[in-house]
Design a protein with these regions (language model features):
Chain B
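Sequence/structural segment immediately N-terminal to covalent heme-attachment motifs in c-type
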Residues: 274-300, 308-326
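Alpha-helical transmembrane segments
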Residues: 57-73
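N-terminal secretory/membrane targeting signals
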Residues: 1-25
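Hydrophobic single transmembrane helices highlighted by the model
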Residues: 42-62
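Extracytoplasmic/periplasmic beta-strand context in beta-sandwich domains
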Residues: 190, 236-239, 305, 331, ...
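Detector for the c-type heme attachment site
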Residues: 226-230, 293-299, 325, 350-354
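Flexible coil segments in periplasmic/lumen-exposed cytochrome c-class electron-transfer proteins
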Residues: 256-277, 282, 286-287, 335-374
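Non-transmembrane, membrane-proximal soluble domains of secreted or membrane proteins
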Residues: 25-48, 69-279
Length: 534, 374
């Protein structure tokens, strides 16, 4: 109906004003912006929790938080960073970019798009309440379980766990709706001539991400609902005394939890698939194999979950299967790294901030990959499991693999979104600052893990002191660097050099690049007639 | 010492992976020395994958560095727009899977070997120990002898540098014997792990997991609970004393004798004086209760209740006996009925009712506990 009014007005950039523009929004760009702002807020909340954790671990002994609050912070840091930060940021980029990239006027289901976003603040409030409720007397033990919320411990927890379970329900509904929307948009809304095999890699990565979420999210929702029933309604799904099995929950959780890792990684790999060709000024190397192997990763990722549970006592045959399946993941990941390197090969490379992040990701994500293979080897994992070696590994996978990919995307698309160039010098300072402090934080943790320091402990023996102090100093620097990130974003939104429709010289090489044919910032409604795809 | 270690840590962090390949063993940059065949095998496997990982990283870093130096625009290099259409571009996608699969199979081959050893339960064990995790201590039951050890964390004052890695009653095991561990838990998940002698398997309430080892060297080996188990997760260390089989037999005989004498003493009808009970109770309290309620009885506000002037410790005796015997559901307070005998329980309760200014003057007798148990 709106479209009719717009057409009679001949005024395509008319947008609603005031709070209604945001609260009732069905516009993919506005919803994308809201996702991104939400993710940024959550980045600072989750980051503040990480700072508290590292401050507590700076010295042995109990200085800042008590053991339960510490474990609750560990739990919420993970949940906020995964569900509150990385996923919404990736969804925000999908909302902004996918319709523009495939030549669609908007998302396929704009009203549902509005609902998927507005469930998030509600979920965030529930999640934060689950942390804060412990300060009210009589609410029982805080959520001291870690983000995996394994029973029976999670059955002992007080009211915080119920709030957390409801929060996970909302987050799940939100992600499933967002995924259905994105997959539907990709399948049905492409401009004429935009075949699947012409889509930018970012669109492909979100196609698989969306499918993964649609498959695995309901399993998590089922798992936590069973947990809720065990807690309050006398069932014993996870209680051996009532004929249940505590390990069943772990299978349900990781059937979601492992594909979730690829949910976090794939959109960033998609961003790399655009950033690296742009700044190498040459087409993506091996586009088709990359798409196929992304599909392979998607399929393989669904059937290797139990490598998170090597120590629960599975049979030899099952363990061997999960070990070999997990090791095979190195094939698609290896191919991606290889293709990105050979996209740069014989290119004409310049080093703008998004490219710097992309190069750092190739190196650090490879490192996470090789420690991943180390961890996949069951007998060795029986030693690594639940130590800081694992903590170091998954932060290497998720910070470069997911978060830095999002930073690369932010710097790559900020000119498109705002119409202004960011300050390149500040961008480069931010890159070096985060990358160095990130390595300072997490590299030593490999060694504290090998030396025997378990995860999720609030206090540690003095033999681990040096590694923890280096790690904490690195973490404070890493946290602080994000104030610069915030400053750069605000500065770019408020003004700066005109970006023009195509701020990057190499942006359209090898892809249809529809998004770069629109002005920056793009009009409120991108296309009124389908664009032409050559 | 500490400073040089710190400098080393910084260096290690900055030099990234290159150092990981060369600086093993010293300065806790690697696993502690394995002293059992299986942990040795795991260590070797770890070294193999570390070396492969290091080589891969050196190659990746090398190629990327070459690319970044050679193909930069500032040097006037022009992009080859048809590179991805060349024969290499068309067929190279087959290359990576073949190479990576080769590496994968090498690793998986040696891993499967070790895994079969881990899962080999066919040989008869010389000693079988049931390891029970509970919030937040370990209990060891020797299945072939009537010995039971409750292992609590030592407070900072006694543990010194080994704080969080030291216990009052370590598990004593003979060297050169096949030892079988049966893992279970009484409340939530735990994981028993002593890296030098035995890998992890989770302790799961209602289920039994199995691990085995054969310790080659006498010594004291330390570990910690590896699976998050609530408030006290950081405070349930593990210590194993490995001794020669002769010393082990002697220790066992003494342990059995002491247990017998204690049982006899506890079941005698003697009436104990308050001071006798208080003196016994102090030691028992400090090893069993102070982990949560603290040595000075103040507890940890908001987490563990204090006992100084508390309703339980200064009020009705029967209520006090009841909570110590049966625990309190929904909290960390465990049931002690099966863990201490009547005399020990009477002593602890007497101590709690008279220490730190709780001057109730009560002397709780073993007979009171005996009747409360019924």
């Amino acid at each position: 109906m709106n479209a009719v009014i717009h057409e009679t007005d001949h005024h395509h950039d008319h947008k609603p004003t005031g709070y209604k523009r945001w609260l009732y929004s069905t516009n993919h760009k506005d919803i994308g912006t809201m996702y991104l702002v939400f993710a940024l807020v959550m980045l600072f909340i989750g980051g503040a929790m990480a700072m508290l954790i590292r401050a507590e671990l700076y010295m042995p002994g109990l200085q800042i938080v008590n053991p339960d609050l510490y474990n609750n912070l560990v739990t919420d840091h993970a949940l906020i960073m995964i569900f509150g930060m990385v996923m919404p940021a990736a969804a925000g980029m999908a909302n902004w970019m996918i319709p523009m990239m495939i030549g669609a006027p908007d998302m396929a289901l704009p009203r549902m798009n509005n609902m998927s976003f507005w469930l998030l603040p509600a979920a965030a409030i529930l999640l934060l309440s689950s942390l804060l409720v412990q300060f009210i007397p009589g609410t029982g033990v805080p959520v001291n379980t870690g983000w995996t919320i394994y029973p029976p411990l999670s059955v002992q927890v007080g009211m915080g766990m119920d709030l957390l379970i409801f929060s996970v329900h909302l987050l799940g509904i939100s992600s499933i709706m967002a995924s259905i929307n994105i997959v539907t948009t990709i399948l049905n809304m492409r401009a004429p001539g935009m075949t699947m095999m012409k889509m930018p890699l970012f669109v492909w990565s979100w196609f698989f991400t969306g499918l993964l979420l649609i498959i695995v999210m309901p399993v998590l929702a089922g798992g936590v609902t069973m947990l809720l029933f065990d807690r309050h309604f006398g069932t014993s799904f996870f209680d051996a005394a009532g004929g249940g099995d505590p390990i069943l929950f772990q299978h349900l959780f990781w059937f979601f939890g492992h594909p979730e890792v690829y949910v976090l990684l794939l959109p960033s790999i998609g961003v790399l698939g655009l950033v690296i060709p742009t700044f190498s000024r040459k087409p993506l190397f091996g586009y088709k194999p990359l798409v196929y192997f992304m599909g392979f990763l998607f399929a393989l990722g669904l059937v290797v979950w139990a490598h998170h549970q090597y120590t629960v006592g599975m049979s030899l045959a099952v363990t061997t299967y999960f070990m070999i399946g997990t090791i095979l993941i190195s094939i698609p990941i290896g191919l991606m790294i290889f293709n990105f390197i050979f996209t740069m090969w014989r290119g004409s490379i310049t080093f703008e901030t998004p490219m710097l992040f992309a190069i750092a990701i190739i190196l650090m994500f490879s490192f996470a990959g090789v420690t991943g293979v180390m961890l996949a080897v069951v007998p060795a994992d029986l030693q690594y499991h639940d130590t800081y070696f694992v903590v170091a590994h998954f932060h290497y996978a998720l910070i470069p693999g997911a978060v830095f990919g999002l930073y690369a995307g932010v710097f790559y698309w900020l000119p498109k979104w705002t119409g202004h160039m960011y300050d390149e010098k500040l961008g480069k300072i931010f890159f070096w600052w985060t990358t160095l402090s990130f390595n300072l934080t997490f590299f030593p943790q490999h060694f504290s893990g090998l030396a025997g320091m378990p995860r999720r402990i609030v206090d540690y023996n003095i033999q681990y002191i040096e590694f923890n102090q280096v790690s904490s100093i690195g973490a404070f620097a890493f946290g602080l660097s994000h104030l610069l990130f915030l400053y750069i974003i605000i500065q770019t939104v408020r003004g700066g050099k005109e970006a023009g429709a195509k701020p990057w010289e190499g942006a359209q090489i090898g892809t249809p690049g529809l998004e770069w044919s629109l002005p920056s910032p793009p009009p409120f409604h991108s296309y009124t007639t389908p664009p032409e795809v050559k | 010492m500490s400073k040089s270690k710190m400098i080393l840590a910084v260096l290690a962090s900055l030099l990234l992976t290159t150092l990981a390949g060369t600086a093993y063993a010293d300065y806790a940059l690697n696993f502690p020395e394995p002293v059992a065949p299986l942990t040795q095998q795991m260590y070797d496997l770890h070294m193999l994958t570390t070396k492969i990982a290091t080589i891969i990283m050196v190659i990746v870093i090398g190629i990327v560095a070459f690319v970044l130096i050679k193909f930069r625009k500032s040097k006037g290099y022009e992009a080859d727009q048809n590179f991805h259409k060349s024969t290499f571009g068309t067929w190279s996608w087959t290359l990576v899977p073949i190479i990576v699969l080769g590496i994968d199979l090498t690793i998986a081959g040696s891993a499967t070997d070790a895994l079969q050893q881990v899962e080999d339960y066919s040989q008869k064990a010389d000693v079988t120990v049931k390891v029970i995790g509970s919030q937040w201590k370990w209990t060891y039951e020797y299945m072939d002898d009537d010995i039971r050890i409750v292992s609590n964390m030592l407070p900072k004052e006694e543990a010194g540098d080994n704080y969080l890695r030291a216990v009052d009653n370590p598990l004593v095991l003979p060297t050169g014997k096949r030892i079988r561990f049966l893992h279970t838990a009484s409340d939530v998940l735990h994981a028993w792990w002593v890296p030098q002698i035995v890998y992890k398997k989770d302790s799961i309430p209602g289920y039994i997991n199995e691990t085995w080892t054969n310790i080659q060297k006498e010594g004291t080996y330390r570990g910690q609970c590896a699976e998050i188990c609530g408030t006290g997760h950081a405070f349930m260390p593990i210590v194993v004393e490995a001794v020669s089989p002769e010393k082990y037999e002697a220790w066992k005989a003494e342990k059995l004798m002491v247990a017998e004498a204690a049982a006899a003493e506890a079941s005698s009808d003697k009436t104990w004086t308050k001071d006798e009970l208080y003196a016994r109770g102090e030691g028992l309290y400090n090893t069993n209760c102070s982990g949560c309620h603290q040595v000075n009885g103040t507890g940890m506000p908001g987490v563990f209740p204090g006992l100084v002037g508390s309703k339980i410790a200064t009020g009705d005796i029967d209520a006090h006996i009841n909570i110590v015997l049966n625990g309190k559901a929904g909290t960390a307070m465990a049931a002690w009925a099966a863990q201490l005998n009547d005399l020990e329980l009477a002593a602890v309760i007497t101590y709690e009712r008279n220490a730190w200014g709780n001057n109730t003057g009560d002397a709780v007798q073993p007979a009171d506990l005996k009747s409360a148990r019924k």
